[in-house]
Amino acid sequence: MRDAAEQLLVDPVEAARRLLGATLTGRGVSGVIVEVEAYGGVPDGPWPDAAAHSYKGLRARNFVMFGPPGRLYTYRSHGIHVCANVSCGPDGTAAAVLLRAAALEDGTDVARGRRGELVHTAALARGPGNLCAAMGITMADNGIDLFDPDSPVTLRLHEPLTAVCGPRVGVSQAADRPWRLWLPGRPEVSAYRRSPRAPAPGTSD
């Protein structure tokens, strides 16, 4: 399965394109990835990105972003919601793709049990925190190999699909980069919200 991971030995935007349409399976739930965001790395690396957790270098928190590709990088947003990323690029070079939304195909009842009985199906895995909640992804999954069939969370790549791109959600730096990609027409895709701390549109990296 590491042959599949080699498909992610590319820049983060290309990796994001390749992850759209992939099947993500976790703890009784599976779905198609419909929205992602690419993140680069350190200032002197090939893809400097001030919005990335890895921008200031290797830390205990972000080491998974430095490879190898195909590993799950988890973190808590605002100290509450678990978010999931897939490492990409050459081993030792920081880059990852944030999984923002998925269209669930199997285990919808399991996901609804985790998210709430009244949550609309299209919203079960809409947004990074909701995706992890629906899939049962936790901080304990940090660093697992997504292409290992014995992992609690696995990934299966397919042929890339046509994507739409635009600015990333909620970042205050590098806020104009069109590094958010999604599948058009999917109701599971989240709404775009620009960070109130970001410069005016057109004035940021």
Swiss-Prot record:
EC number: 3.2.2.-
Gene Ontology molecular function, alphabetical: alkylbase DNA N-glycosylase activity; DNA binding
Record keywords: DNA damage, DNA repair, Hydrolase
GO biological process, one term: base-excision repair
Pfam families according to UniProt: Pur_DNA_glyco (PF02245)
Family the UniProt entry places it in: Belongs to the DNA glycosylase MPG family.
Protein name: Putative 3-methyladenine DNA glycosylase
Species the sequence originates in: Mycolicibacterium paratuberculosis (strain ATCC BAA-968 / K-10) (Mycobacterium paratuberculosis)
Species lineage: Bacteria, Bacillati, Actinomycetota, Actinomycetes, Mycobacteriales
